[in-house]
Amino acid sequence: MAYITRELERKFLKLNDFFKVILVTGARQVGKTTMLKHLAGSDRTYVTMDNTMARDLAQSDPVLFFQTYKPPILIDEVQKAPELFEQIKIICDESDEKGLIWLTGSQQYNMMKRVRETLAGRIGILELYSLSAREKAGLVFDTDLDFSFATLQARQRKVPKNDVIQVFQHIWEGGMPQVQGVDDELRQEYFNSYIDTYLMRDATEVGGITDAVRFRKFLVGCASLVSEQVNYSTLAESADIAPSTAKEWLNVLVGLRIIYLLASYSNNELKRLSKTPKLYFCDTGLCAYLSMWLTPDTLRSGAASGHYYENYVVMELVKNYAYAKSKVNLTYFRDSNAKEIDVFVEENNVIHPLEIKKSAAPDRREIKKYSVIDKASLIRGNGGIICMCQEPIPIDADNCFIPSNLI
């Protein structure tokens, strides 16, 4: 398989010229090592903490480890040898060289606190997700996403028209690099192996989860709640565990970057807002496998298709902003009357409200809900309805129907 250019490369190279250490986090198998090896020069040493001998040396004698594996260096799965962080700090303090040490880590559950305590001010931290639809298509947009009609029109000129069959092919296939272009049998075997080896092993190491049968049932339970508010009682029932255990297991999956929780919007001026997050899978292909959707067509025509489409759009937004120049805050809005807005994109104190609909011609009256923003001292920016329409269409001066392939 040919190398697929990752959108994170631009940001990584920029931070590499500024920080002495760069850490790229993300779930197992999303392409962290592949990307960094692609960017590394021939003089950069590579070592993985999956190697037992290298890991034992790193844990027992970090000084000797760096004498053996000299910087500039790429250390894979560094969370398995947290003993290295103190020595990395010493190396950074003794050198002015930027980009000296590259790290990857796939378990954020316990690692990040140690990293921030030890390497504050010395390390740049980035997150890589599985392949986005844009990356798979080789698309690069010249304009930042601001949801204005002009920006959407500029993006539309670079892409083919939205196609529901292609969208659900991507949703069903997912973005794991190793399943791109493989047949159905190999895809199923890949995800089965991914759960039984990587996921189960990491869940045991990080969260002490040892019951493989209940853990798989819990994963299936999570897949059944995709794009819905988290319900710990329902998750607990799916795996015959206590709700408190379900909360712990979900936190493990969030730390392993299998699950993404979209926080609810909070504002002191707007009363009685929900505080419960919504549940999404970082990779829709894994979610579809767990729910036994055997083909893209059955998923597209199935009862859960709208939920999967929402999951797809939310994660495309997450990926877009994870790799973008500016930072934003992504939330959703829901009040005690069940009035809900699927996504708030908050940037520079401006809120861009977005609804997500699988339809190619959703009801334009959906945007009336956005007036709730005006009840507080908030600035409402451009927004709209992300859907399966084939080109951007203005709804009013501030909102558009937005083709989902433009995000």
Where would I find each of the regions flagged by the language model?
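A cross-kingdom feature that marks ATP-driven nucleic-acid transaction machinery
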Residues: 1-29, 33-49, 71, 251-252, ...
